[in-house]
Swiss-Prot record:
It comes from the Viruses. Putative initation factor. This is Initiation factor TFIIB homolog. Belongs to the asfivirus C315R family. It comes from African swine fever virus (isolate Pig/Kenya/KEN-50/1950).
Amino acid sequence: MDALLKEIEKLSQPSSLQKENNDVCDLCFMQMKKISNYQLLCEECGQLKDWFEPDYNEKFTVYSRLKIVGANSSYHQRDLDKANSSDYSSLQFHHILEELKSLNVKYMDAGQKPFPIQVLKETAHSYNQVQQHRVIRSITKLQILASILRSICLKLNIACTVADAARFTQLNTKGISRGMDLLRSLFEDNKITLNVDLNPIDSFINSTYSALQIKQIHQELQEENVYNLKEIVKSFIVYADEKNIGVDLNRRTVVIATMYNVLRRAYYPIEIDTVVYQCKIRKNTITRALKMYEDYYSHFKSLYEQYQLNAAKKLI
């Protein structure tokens, strides 16, 4: 009996093949080389293969995912995944986090500002929550990751457009509507706590303020005035939305144009070329948004007067 127990215990340990990573290529059957924490490369034919080595914990006799094969396997796999040990959920979290870190490096290499590690961790955690309720495959996974990333950023007041999120996950299109719809349905059913319908205005105001370096340029600007400036910009945008003015314009563009308009009318010496350069936006794009304030001047005049701004129809 003791010999049998020892044999069972031996079988439950990770084998030498698993430790040495002797995975073979499906195409040429050559041994594949580990090139990252989640990818293998066949040096013979160049095929890449997703892979992840879990941290083995002797407390658990099962440390890898159990898979059901045969008829109706996908139907029963969901129940098995939910019933599996909590260790698997932890492994999945680390797997997704490593994938997000890799995407973050590529995003930074492409000239974009990387996302904070807190955003990546919360994205991985929320994705883990979604996995408990949905079986996710292929392009849907990338759209869900992009949707979660954007929602986490908005929650933390970090600017992130739909295009930014799609670019981060390397989607071929800039649309993430399928991922947003799935997350929205799970939120409405109280299955996840992440709200995907947060207003992005606050995050765009903060990022635009930082990009224009208002505090550095005007050191006499006190914290109270900084708060007032952001609140004034927001009040203009909220008012425009209530009147259905400029609702078809990109939200980030509206924020940048509004802040420039407010600063000019508050007699701050800022030029449109500075805004174009600092905010990385095209001049004709911001000009179209500024035209909104010219075309609907009569609507905004009362706000100019309320906040003691220059209320002239056209600024010189």
